[in-house]
Amino acid sequence: MNEIAKPAFLNSDYKLVWHDEFDGNEINPDKWSFNSAMSAKSVLNTENKENARIENGKLVLENHRIDDSGSKCRYSTATSLTTYDTMNYRFGYVEMSAKIPFLYGGPWPSFWTKSIGGIRPRTNKDYMVEVDIFEVFSSPNHLAYTLHK
């Protein structure tokens, strides 16, 4: 296992309250659920397990191009996982180690957090907060992070 340096801001008051080391053979349904509500015009998010798997201690998320011969449209299937029902906290920090593809016209990898008030079921949007820790827009030179209120 590669050693990753601890962030400088961590102190002894922090306690690990949620983690997944992906050491099993399949995605743990007690920690993760598929989210088919996220989509884009040419991407159909799916709960198809062919798009997500555990491999060598890593979560692998894929998208698959749908070959529609003769069509000018390009569609693909992707997957979106959420911890909505298993990881809700008011304070703290989150971290992830990831290998991100930079493919033009391909996937849109992202790592978001959302407040409970802004997602299923849609409650008062005035209280919704979304933090885009990162979003990759198919360019090796562009990485976005945003706070939405």
Can you say where each PLM-predicted feature lies in the sequence?
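GH16 jelly-roll
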Residues: 1-149
